[in-house]
């Protein structure tokens, strides 16, 4: 059991709702993974009438909605989108995304901090999508963000943890903040590695939605997240350069001599 934004949760896996072959398959994947938080784009919800079925399906799921500002590239766009999302979804949660480069989909750190500062003052619980840059994360925390969502690699790349050192440093430097890896994971083993490092949760979309079987993949990621977290809580042994016998030699009729 853990808490985020004043909400008690069991699952440490969050799922995005885009790119699935069908809305029903998305719903099945969410249920298979036992997910309790799903992200949704406000811009999709403001699209034509044909999307009403998708919205109705989202509302039928026993999940908390985390609207995002996907597609925004400026403070003004992001803040206005966040305000609209609060009215539409009746939540003060907002996943803040402000893209600075269309090729890498890397967030714009300067606009991100400015927008986060405004939204925190307006009472939002801001979930900023950011890089693993320590100084950027510190500025976001200084702005009032209690949650940080650094990427492991560029969105949709599936490359896994590209800068393990920087991510581990974030965990060490921000022990009281909730850290959720957002973007770049492609395999359940990536998620397990993140959780073993002490991160609080993982947000996925492409790795599940674009899998050959999204439902099975969602379930696999859920187990990996749980296993990784248990490994962290259990206290893993440190790696050694030499072997260490697990069977005691007390009472043995012989001794092992060094070569």
From Swiss-Prot:
Superkingdom of the source species: Bacteria
UniProt binding sites for 1-deoxy-D-xylulose 5-phosphate: 156, 183-184, 205-206
Keyword Cytoplasm: yes
Swiss-Prot/TrEMBL catalytic activity: [ThiS sulfur-carrier protein]-C-terminal-Gly-aminoethanethioate + 2-iminoacetate + 1-deoxy-D-xylulose 5-phosphate = [ThiS sulfur-carrier protein]-C-terminal Gly-Gly + 2-[(2R,5Z)-2-carboxy-4-methylthiazol-5(2H)-ylidene]ethyl phosphate + 2 H2O + H(+)
One of the protein's GO biological processes: thiamine diphosphate biosynthetic process
Family matches, as InterPro entries: Aldolase_TIM, Thiazole_synthase_ThiG, ThiG
Catalytic residues (positions): 95 (schiff-base intermediate with dxp)
Molecular function terms, GO-annotated: thiazole synthase activity
Cellular component GO terms held in the UniProt record: cytoplasm
Compartment(s) of residence: Cytoplasm
Annotated metabolic or biological route of this protein: Cofactor biosynthesis; thiamine diphosphate biosynthesis
Record EC number: 2.8.1.10
Pfam families linked to this entry: ThiG (PF05690)
Sorted UniProt keywords: Cytoplasm, Schiff base, Thiamine biosynthesis, Transferase
Function: Catalyzes the rearrangement of 1-deoxy-D-xylulose 5-phosphate (DXP) to produce the thiazole phosphate moiety of thiamine. Sulfur is provided by the thiocarboxylate moiety of the carrier protein ThiS. In vitro, sulfur can be provided by H(2)S.
Subunit and partners: Homotetramer. Forms heterodimers with either ThiH or ThiS.
Family affiliation: Belongs to the ThiG family.
Protein name in UniProt: Thiazole synthase
Native organism: Coxiella burnetii (strain Dugway 5J108-111)
